[in-house]
């Protein structure tokens, strides 16, 4: 019997409650696992260099470095599918549009 490979998800968000909520949702999917989380982009770089994620869930607004800046840096070194999100609707919407450009 072949072992099915699960999609490895890395979540980058500074809010622990958001990480816990997404972890619960992702881990309910039979083909996905939230294998790591990082509270900021600098910690995320360490995780990405150690274990290559299949997809990154990335908060747009974080301290130290915002998600858009991190996205630009990481895509040049480690291209990987990224899903961006924000819990701050008004500012997050404008930043999400900027990220798509």
Regions found by a protein language model. Name each.
Residues 51-57:
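Active-site beta3 strand of CheY-like receiver
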Residues 13, 59:
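Active-site residues of response regulator receiver
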Residues 85-87:
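Hydrophobic/aromatic residues positioned on beta-strands within the core alpha/beta folds
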Residues 40-43, 66-69:
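Acidic catalytic/metal-coordinating carboxylates
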Residues 62:
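Receiver (REC) domain active-site loop signature in two-component systems and cognate sites
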């Amino acid at each position: 019997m072949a072992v099915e490979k699960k999609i490895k998800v890395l979540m980058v968000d500074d809010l622990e409650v958001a990480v816990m909520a997404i972890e619960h949702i992702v881990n309910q999917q039979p083909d996905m696992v939230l294998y790591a989380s990082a509270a900021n982009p600098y910690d995320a770089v360490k995780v990405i260099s150690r274990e290559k994620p299949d997809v990154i869930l990335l908060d747009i607004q974080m301290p130290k470095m915002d998600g858009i800046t991190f996205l630009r840096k990481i895509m040049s070194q480690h291209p990987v599918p990224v899903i961006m999100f924000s819990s701050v609707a008004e500012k997050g919407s404008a930043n999400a549009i900027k990220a798509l450009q």
